[in-house]
């Protein structure tokens, strides 16, 4: 009997211990929360710096003299190849603008027709000449129109230096950044014509502080040496054959860059419609005339819809080609010529 009692006690203790173990196990399962944070799996990743164009002034002493000269020519154009040049044979530009009055920050500013990577896009077809064109051809287009001057000889020291500077700017441009530095921001073209009164108000609010109420800009100590802020119309501005004389092109430039120091390609200060109206206002004033513009765009279908001078391959008025509305003209070319126009 005592042996049976002893065995019963032992079994009771055994089952009690087993029961306690099972309870503890279930409690553990229900309350367990695994640590999901990885341990020692992530290694330090070095920070990457976004690509930016090189600053020539920061590496001036180590830069090829030809590139240095190109920089001087585009940033002090009037002094070295314009009215301020030392001798008559060096005077190729007809006004006191600098190339960098439009191609901002030494041609490095995205959204201002930057030169970063531009030489890699040439030769290319240009509708104005209706042929494949070189970078030298494109530069001379600006010389004759925006700079209101004459062509640089293609093999001249000035041309070679300007091209060398442009090539230097894009020499290490990553392929995935090519489009970033191309052209201007795309304008959402308004459905309405330019409102010159609204443009005047916007100009007074946002532009006159730098360019003057009379649009004649602010020159440096010696006017023949260029401008701090360029004139936007009048005898020392771009001529009427320049791309900037087209309302859509001017509006795209304004959208990304003006007011200067406040707007960028990604963060414009003005709305699309405000940029459009002020561009029309600026281009409503007299400026130098470019001879023989009727020969531009031999294939008239390729002429931008906002080109303010004829002839055109349509029956829209000169007034509408200058001030809009442009969507009906764009639609005409889409329906009749299967062409998609953006400017």
How would you label these PLM feature ranges?
Residues 234-299:
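Active-site/pore-lining binding-face segments in mid-to-C-terminal subdomains
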Residues 83-136, 217-259:
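Gly/Gly-Pro-rich "capping" loops immediately C-terminal to redox-active cysteine motifs
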Residues 48-90, 171-204, 217-219:
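Electrostatic cytochrome c docking/interface patches
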Residues 177-181, 213-226, 264-266, 293-295:
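Short acidic alpha-helical/loop segments enriched in Asp/Glu that coordinate divalent cations
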Residues 70, 96-107, 162, 199-218, ...:
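The canonical Cys-X-X-Cys-His
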Residues 74-81, 103-106, 142-150, 166-173, ...:
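Sec/Tat-exported extracytoplasmic proteins
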């Amino acid at each position: 009997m005592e042996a049976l009692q002893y065995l019963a006690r032992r079994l009771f203790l055994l089952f009690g211990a087993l029961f306690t173990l099972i309870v503890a196990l279930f409690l553990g399962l229900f309350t367990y929360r695994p640590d999901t944070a990885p341990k020692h799996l992530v290694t330090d990743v070095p920070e990457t710096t976004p690509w930016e164009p090189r600053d020539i002034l920061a590496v001036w002493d180590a830069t090829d003299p030809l590139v240095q000269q190109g920089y001087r020519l585009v940033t002090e154009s009037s002094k070295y190849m314009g009215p301020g040049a030392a001798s008559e044979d060096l005077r190729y530009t007809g006004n006191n603008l600098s190339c960098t009055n439009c191609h901002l920050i030494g041609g490095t500013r995205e959204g201002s027709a930057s030169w970063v990577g531009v030489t890699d896009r040439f030769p290319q077809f240009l509708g104005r000449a209706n042929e494949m064109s070189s970078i030298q051809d494109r530069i001379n287009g600006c010389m004759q129109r925006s700079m209101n001057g004459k062509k640089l000889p293609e093999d001249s020291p000035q041309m070679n230096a300007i091209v060398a500077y442009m090539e230097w700017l894009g020499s290490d441009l990553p392929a995935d950044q090519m489009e970033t530095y191309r052209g201007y921001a795309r304008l959402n073209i308004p459905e309405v014509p330019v409102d010159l009164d609204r443009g005047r108000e916007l100009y007074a609010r946002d532009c006159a502080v730098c360019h003057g109420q009379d649009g004649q800009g602010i020159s440096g100590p010696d006017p023949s040496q260029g401008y701090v802020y360029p004139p936007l119309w009048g005898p020392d501005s771009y001529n009427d054959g320049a791309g900037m004389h087209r309302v859509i092109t001017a509006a795209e430039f304004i959208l990304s860059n003006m007011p200067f120091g406040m707007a960028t390609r990604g963060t414009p200060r003005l709305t699309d419609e405000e940029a459009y109206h002020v561009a029309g206002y600026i281009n409503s004033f007299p400026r130098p005339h470019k001879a023989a513009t009727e020969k531009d765009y031999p294939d008239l279908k390729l002429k931008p819809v906002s080109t303010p001078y004829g002839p055109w391959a349509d029956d829209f008025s000169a007034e509408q080609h200058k001030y809009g509305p442009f969507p009906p003209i764009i639609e005409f070319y889409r329906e009749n010529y299967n062409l998609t126009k953006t400017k």
